[in-house]
Amino acid sequence: MPHPKAIFLTGATGFLGSHLTARFLVEGRQVKVLARSSKDLSARHRVEATLQDVGITEFENLTVVEGDISLDGLGLSADIRNDLASSVEEVWHCAASLSFQDENRAEIFRMNVDGTRHVVDLVKIVPGHRLHHVSTAYIAGKRSDVALENEIDVGQTFRNPYEESKCRAELIISEAHRAGAVTASIYRPSIVIGDSRSGRVTHFHGVYAFIRALWTVLERMRRRASETRNASPRETQGPRGAAMGGTRSLNNGRVHLPLRVLGMDNQTLNFVPIDYVVDGMLEISRRKDSIGSTYHLTNPVPTKNGFWLPNICRILGVEGIRLVGESSFVMTPTSKLEALFQKQMAFYYQYLQGEPRFDCRRVLEALKNTGIQCPRVTVEFISKMMGWYVDFLASQAGRAGLEL
């Protein structure tokens, strides 16, 4: 039976938003998405290119509306806003700035806080429209206790403007819902990674940026080692033949990379695969009792840093990387390589020293008897994720002739 009205979605070019859009299109839904054009590509071209990466080839049911969440009225004319309000039955707000730097604070708040307010204003035009807001579990900030699904602002401090802005956005949604202006549900995924069945991922934030940085350094070292073996003695005496900060190739084909990473082995990161997040959100969204509730799409069994990092290093063929406390850098100064990593990975290092424990009882109850379960992060799971991504990096480097 065809659905009478369409879905309106923001953030269709993002990781989660593109997968949600793809699922709706596969289900035969009419989907209208808000997107910006770029310097070189139209809004529609950007959306279609992103959806093709997710496996979508038919766009008959897709309408792309050019606009911007950071602008009043989403940058749309009154006629277009009224048409959207009358032609859609659900609004999924996935768009967000993922930046975290303090110097970008104004832009982050413009996108994440003002943008949410502008989406709420659209939904208010026709009361009763269902608003689904995608937030993050990390609005819990620097808390180290159990973060409950019904909590928003409990006086916590934040690691960065991104977390704070997403918390502020939730407060806007919550206030509008309590006032009866919108009918809303909020979803808080944790660290979203690739598909649990294939390992495939289409956006490369978070832990993938860390892996890419490591992989690039290792490939550069292996290439230089190969060149050195084939070079004359005179050619190996200069900087090109020198080792990088104590790095060396081992007889077993692995690389020793003396790299200290600020973090704690016994702390965790909460990884959730994209398919679980999408399946879970859609299942929950169809439950009438989900109206007015917030859900942690998090892993009930978070992964210890002392488990995932060594397994990633094993697959990459590197030894010598270890998590240390701040005192280690007091006793032994930071190396050039460590300084480089700290600069590139500043955002992600914030999370290696501890995170809250996310209570997800609402999600577990809602998904009970549905067959939707979050997989545990095992050695096999990590191998699948890493295998796909390493193959992807190698193929991209080969096609682009990447200078390592």
Stretch-by-stretch model annotation:
Residues 280-347, 389, 393-404:
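Mid/C-terminal beta-alpha module of Rossmann-like enzyme folds, strongest
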Residues 157-190, 195:
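Active-site Tyr-X1-5-Lys
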